[in-house]
Curated annotation (Swiss-Prot):
Binds 1 pyridoxal phosphate per subunit. Its EC number is 2.6.1.52. It comes from Yersinia pestis. This is Phosphoserine aminotransferase. Pathway: Amino-acid biosynthesis; L-serine biosynthesis; L-serine from 3-phospho-D-glycerate: step 2/3; Cofactor biosynthesis; pyridoxine 5'-phosphate biosynthesis; pyridoxine 5'-phosphate from D-erythrose 4-phosphate: step 3/5. One of its GO terms (molecular function) is O-phospho-L-serine:2-oxoglutarate aminotransferase activity. Homodimer. The keyword Disulfide bond does not apply. The gene is serC. It is found in: Cytoplasm. HAMAP family: SerC_aminotrans_5.
Amino acid sequence: MTQVYNFSAGPAMLPVEVLRRAEQELRNWHGLGTSVMEISHRSKEFMQVAEESEKDLRDLLQIPANYKVLFCHGGARAQFAAVPLNLLGDRNSADYIDGGYWAHSAIKEAQKYCTPNVIDVTTHDNGLTGIQPMKQWKLSDNAAYVHYCPNETIDGVAINEQPDFGNKVVVADYSSSILSRPIDISRYGVIYAGAQKNIGPAGLTLVIVREDLLGKAHTALPSILDYKVLADNDSMFNTPPTFAWYLSGLVFKWLKEQGGLGEMEKRNQAKAELLYGAIDRTGFYRNQVAITNRSWMNVPFQMADASLDKLFLSEAEAQGLQALKGHRVAGGMRASIYNAMPIEGVKALTDFMADFERRHG
C-alpha cells in the first residue's frame, strides 16, 4: 500500500500513534466492554478523561491559574458571535484586525452585535502579501477588546509577534496554529480554537478565558455560548462532544511524549523551511507571502503555468499526497503541515515537486 500523507487544512491529519490507540480502544475502552462514545459524560471514567485532558493542556501551554479552559461546541464560527456577546459589556465597539479571510469573517459576524473598528494591517509589496508590525496597528482607546487571527489558513499569512498592548483585552483565533509552538497565554484575554486543524477531530472547540472577563455576557446570549455558564459547569452544561474530547486528550498526551511545544516548534520550523525552500528554488513554483509572514502551518503555492494545476494534483494524489488543492477562494495548491505531519511527508512532497518540475518545467 502506498504511504499516504494528508495535507488537508481541516479536518486534518492526526498522529498515527493516536489513531492506533483509538482503534485499539474503540470497542472496549478501559475494559468496560463499551466504547468511550457510549458512556455517560458524567461517569467517573469520562470525568477522568476531562480532568486529564485539561491538566495536560495546561501543562503544554503553561496556562496560568487565573484562566479557565472550556471545551465547547460550535467551532470558531460560534466564537465569532460568542466573543462580542461575552466581552462587550456596556461598550459598543471593539478593535478588529483585518489580516485575511478568517479575520474578515469574524468582523462580519461581530457587526451584528457592535460597531467594529476595522483595522486593515495587510501590506502588498512587489506582489507579496504581508502584515504590518504590531506597533503600527492603530488601536482605539475605547474598544472593549482587540481581536485578531494569528494564522490565516487560506492565504498562508501568519502574525508571529506576540501582542503587547498594555491592559487591553486581546482576543485571538488560534484555530490553525495553537500548540504549534509556545505562546505566552498571559498576554491574552481570550484564546479560542476549533479542534479540527491542530488539536483533534472536528466537533470540539477550545476556549481559554481569563477569569476576570467572566460574568459580563449580554442578557440575550444563549447559555450554551456563555463563558461563565460553561465554566461554572465544567464544560458540561449540556452533553459535550465526548469522542472529540477524548481524542484531543490523546493528542495532548502525544504532544507531551514528543517533548512538548518547544520540540513541536523545532519540527514545524524545519518542515516549513524545507517546503518553502523547494518553492523558492526556481521560478516554477511561487509563494506570494512576505517571508516574515509566511505560515508554518499552511503553505499555499502556485505554478507559473496554472494549466498544470490539475495534472499536478492528480499525479500527487496517485503518489499518496492527498488534499493539496488550494482553497476555492485562492486557487492553486496548499499544503497544510500541522503538528501531526511528519517531516517524511514534507520530504515526499518536495521530492514529488522536484520530479514534476523536471518533467514539465
